[in-house]
Amino acid sequence: MLGSRIHGKRLGIIGMGRIGQAIAKRAKVFGISIHYHNRNQLPSQIEEAYEATYWKNLGEMVKRMDIVSINCPLTEKTKGMISENILKLMMPNSYIINSSRSEIIDEKALVRMLQEKKIAGAGLDVFGAEKKLKTELLNLPNTILIPHMGSATVEGRIEMGEKVIVNIKTFIDGHNPQNRII
């Protein structure tokens, strides 16, 4: 059983906001080439900081990437964005990672692509509620499932608590909290 080195791989980040940029920062250290698809192209100074290449067309980006990382919010535009047609564009030796929302990927198509080895593997921090699909995903040797545990660290939870306190204080002071939900 042989693995593959990560140095020199191409990473396509879907959603280059705060989390996407944090991933780009870490990936760059490993010599990974950073590419991204986003609602809007980032300012040139941010692109230069990550040596990132913008792709307006999602399909054109996906078909050239070794790794695709989904980090965008779930909206009407992103729901189902990673369709069977997009998955079919991926290379057979490529991997897809979803740490965003399960509804962004057509999970039935993803299961088929993984079973047929049209995609090398998947890392899913989120997945749908359909029991049959979860069972199929769990039984795939080329898939890793962790139930939305990306922030399940002591430091992460302390940081979340501190943000809550800052947001409450900001609201009480009559200002708009940074992480407002409604």
Give residue spans per PLM region.
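Rossmann-like dinucleotide-binding domain for NAD(H)/NADP(H)
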Residues: E84, N93-I182
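Rossmann-like dinucleotide/phosphate-binding beta-alpha-beta segment
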Residues: M1-P92
